[in-house]
């Protein structure tokens, strides 16, 4: 399986770039991982609908989505791994929210909670939670005590 974390827009803060790189590196110990900076929702839909490939599982992060805890996210990751999903995409959208067409194309819409976060910080939180999810699946002590 390949895990892709996609965000719209350029990264402005060097600290965010550093943390993004760190969590992508940590994730790569558990799953083939790629972080992608794209320019638009249309680019995300093109990535999702590439011809000749099995359709990926597309998870959109949105304030209106389903809220899940770390263990639930781990179960979600494990389920898709065990089902043989080849491409799992988590996407953080534009600041004005996802267009209806994009929301309709999603396999799942998840929320990181009711708090509003800057998109760059939301990316780091998502990457950390994905890393935590994989450590839960493998019994790594990272999650213990949290």
Swiss-Prot record:
Catalytic activity: pseudouridine(1915) in 23S rRNA + S-adenosyl-L-methionine = N(3)-methylpseudouridine(1915) in 23S rRNA + S-adenosyl-L-homocysteine + H(+)
Keywords annotated in UniProt: Cytoplasm, Methyltransferase, rRNA processing, S-adenosyl-L-methionine, Transferase
Binding site for S-adenosyl-L-methionine: 60, 93, 112-117
Keyword Transferase carried by entry: yes
One Pfam assignment: SPOUT_MTase
Subcellular compartments: Cytoplasm
MF GO annotations: rRNA (pseudouridine-N3-)-methyltransferase activity
Cellular component GO terms held in the UniProt record: cytoplasm
InterPro entries per the UniProt record, alphabetical: Alpha/beta_knot_MTases, RlmH-like, tRNA_m1G_MTases_N
Chief subcellular location: cytoplasm
Record bears the keyword Metal-binding: no
Enzyme Commission (EC) number: 2.1.1.177
Family the entry assigns: Belongs to the RNA methyltransferase RlmH family.
Subunit text: Homodimer.
Role noted for this protein: Specifically methylates the pseudouridine at position 1915 (m3Psi1915) in 23S rRNA.
Annotated protein name in UniProt: Ribosomal RNA large subunit methyltransferase H
């Amino acid at each position: 399986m390949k895990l892709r974390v996609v965000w719209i827009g350029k990264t402005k803060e060097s600290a965010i770039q550093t943390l993004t790189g760190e969590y992508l590196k940590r994730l790569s110990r558990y799953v083939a991982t790629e972080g992608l900076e794209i320019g638009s929702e249309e680019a995300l839909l093109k990535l999702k609908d590439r011809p000749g490939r099995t359709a990926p599982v597309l998870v959109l992060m949105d304030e209106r989505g389903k809220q899940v805890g770390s263990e639930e996210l781990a179960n979600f990751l494990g389920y898709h791994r065990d089902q043989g999903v080849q491409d799992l995409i988590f996407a953080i959208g534009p600041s004005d929210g996802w267009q209806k067409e994009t929301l309709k194309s999603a396999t799942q819409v998840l929320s990181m909670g009711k708090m509003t976060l800057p998109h760059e910080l939301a990316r780091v939180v998502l990457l950390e939670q994905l890393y935590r999810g994989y450590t839960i699946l493998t019994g790594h002590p990272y999650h213990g005590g949290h």
